[in-house]
């Protein structure tokens, strides 16, 4: 079995450890993050897929995932927050520092993704940016990096 494959095939009700739901979920998140990083690095390192093609796939996935186009910046932010995997809710990774109908600014309090990418976490963030571009493509909002771990969604 390759590192990006999973052997878990049971129904969710059977797979969840009811006595330690938080720990079980945390393990699944780490498993998912690791498998994504392994898949992307394996495909691009072997030349099977170009990274630009993966960004296009991520963008198209984002476009297809939208069920309701956000009309306010807080709605756009919640679309991202509901779609992206940023740890457990208790981790409070995406901390809003400003919110108006036209703008949301937030900071990511920690980098939960970098550890899985063997020094190439920029790959994850480029794929995430492409996904977000797709998610916001039908709206009037754009994502802007403000430097560090601060981001802005605005018109």
Language-model-detected regions and their locations in the chain:
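Beta-rich nucleic-acid/ligand-interaction surfaces
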Residues: 145-155
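Sequence-level detector for tyrosine residue identity
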Residues: 4, 22, 124-125, 151
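Short, hydrophobic/π-rich interface segment
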Residues: 101-146
């Amino acid at each position: 079995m390759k590192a990006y494959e999973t052997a878990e095939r049971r129904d969710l009700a059977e797979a969840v450890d009811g006595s330690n739901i938080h720990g079980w979920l945390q393990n699944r998140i780490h498993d998912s993050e690791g498998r994504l990083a392994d898949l992307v690095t394996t495909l691009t390192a072997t030349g099977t897929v170009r990274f630009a093609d993966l960004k296009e796939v991520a963008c198209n996935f984002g476009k297809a995932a939208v069920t309701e186009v956000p009309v306010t910046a807080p709605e756009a932010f919640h679309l991202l927050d509901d779609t992206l995997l940023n740890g457990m809710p208790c981790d409070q990774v995406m901390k809003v520092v400003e919110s108006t109908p036209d703008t949301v600014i937030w900071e990511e309090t920690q980098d939960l993704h970098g550890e899985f990418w063997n020094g190439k976490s920029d790959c994850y963030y480029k794929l995430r940016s492409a996904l977000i571009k797709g998610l916001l493509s039908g709206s009037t909002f754009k994502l802007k990096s403000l430097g560090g771990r601060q981001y802005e969604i605005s018109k």
